[in-house]
């Protein structure tokens, strides 16, 4: 089969690295890829958010399976558009349609979704109006965090230490458009205390198989200081106890979300990722992502004992239950090398 990996980061290098040894892989392409993926397959000069360009490449290179790394092409409907290509032989996609991807692309949708389906999460309010949000933070019912509703590359969560700082954050997001349209609506939610955990799982729209538990480190500087980033490093552990715990959490947070999305007419295929926090009242979901985590993927895939191509194919065909995913015992860590000025100076044209 001809495979296409969409994305340009270290996450996509890890995916391409694993797919390069898959039994299903004939030719491997990356769009746009990077210097690392160039040694594994063929890089195509196509941006990850260039949906028409990707669709043309799928036809030109006779792609059978598309594995999408970042969230943006998914929210732009890449998986949906792929279904419209080659009616006689449509390419398969490891990644959800735009409707299911809203679980990441809209924090207000995700929070309301969790509430509808009984998934434990923090209390919250959603605001479109700066004045209403400003009045709320003057006498909030709980310590709070502020989240931009839209996609912000992991940099849309703010933990103010005072009402004045919170007001400045709201004005920057809602008036100054510091994150563009992503901050025009905000979620103000209860600030929970506890250790955070990244819970990822393979999903075929009906069932979920959990990956080992992992943990990313979001703060820019040493000793958990500095602003939040997309992640400066991650660890993962695949001991038998960790895998058992991970699957138990997945039954509530991942399978519950998978079933909820299917009930609402948006079945989820791909990697479903729940950001959890272990509170004194039990685990709660902070957020959902509709794709492999970055940098968690770089720590998880070296522990995967199964054929990643076969797993993706089983998910895309809705037959994951027939393919038990295996992990080798051990642990893995990854450290991010970031360009100067990250995360202040970041964007699609600025390498991390």
Locate predicted features.
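ATP-binding N-terminal substructure of ATP-dependent carboxylate-amine bond-forming enzymes
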Residues: 1-96
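ATP-dependent carboxylate/acyl-activation modules
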Residues: 4-5, 223, 280, 330, ...
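A conserved helix-loop-beta module that forms one wall/lid of the active-site cleft
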Residues: 88-156
């Amino acid at each position: 089969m001809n495979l296409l990996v969409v994305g340009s980061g270290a996450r996509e290098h890890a995916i391409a690295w694993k797919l390069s040894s898959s039994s299903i892989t004939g030719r491997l392409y990356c769009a746009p890829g990077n210097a690392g993926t160039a040694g594994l397959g063929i890089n195509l000069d196509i941006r990850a958010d260039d949906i028409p360009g990707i669709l043309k490449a799928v036809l030109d290179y006779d792609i059978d399976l598309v594995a999408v790394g970042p969230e943006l092409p998914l929210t732009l409907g890449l998986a949906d558009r792929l279904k419209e290509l080659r009616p006689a032989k449509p390419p398969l996609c490891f990644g959800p349609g735009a409707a299911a991807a809203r679980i990441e692309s809209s924090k207000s949708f995700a929070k309301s979704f969790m509430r509808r389906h009984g998934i434990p999460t923090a209390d919250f309010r959603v605001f479109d109006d700066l004045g209403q949000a400003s009045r709320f933070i003057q006498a909030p019912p709980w310590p709070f965090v502020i989240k931009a509703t839209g996609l912000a590359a992991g940099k849309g969560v703010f933990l103010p230490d005072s009402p004045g700082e919170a007001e400045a954050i709201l004005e920057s997001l809602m008036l100054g458009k510091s994150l563009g349209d992503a901050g025009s609506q905000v979620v103000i939610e209860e600030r929970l205390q506890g250790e955070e955990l990244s819970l990822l799982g393979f999903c075929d729209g009906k069932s979920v198989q959990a990956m080992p538990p992992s943990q990313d480190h979001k703060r820019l500087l040493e000793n958990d200081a500095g602003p939040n980033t997309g992640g400066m490093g991650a660890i993962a552990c695949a001991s038998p106890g960790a895998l058992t715990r991970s699957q138990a959490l997945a039954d509530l947070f991942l399978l519950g979300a998978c079933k909820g999305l299917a009930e609402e007419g948006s079945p989820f295929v791909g990697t479903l990722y729940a950001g959890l926090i272990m509170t004194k009242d039990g685990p709660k979901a902070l957020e959902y992502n509709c794709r492999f985590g970055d940098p968690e993927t770089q720590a998880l895939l070296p522990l995967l004992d199964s054929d990643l191509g076969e797993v993706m194919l089983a998910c895309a065909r809705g037959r994951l239950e027939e393919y038990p995913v295996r992990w080798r015992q051990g642990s893995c860590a990854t450290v991010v090398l970031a360009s100067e000025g990250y995360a202040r100076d970041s964007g699609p044209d600025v390498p991390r």
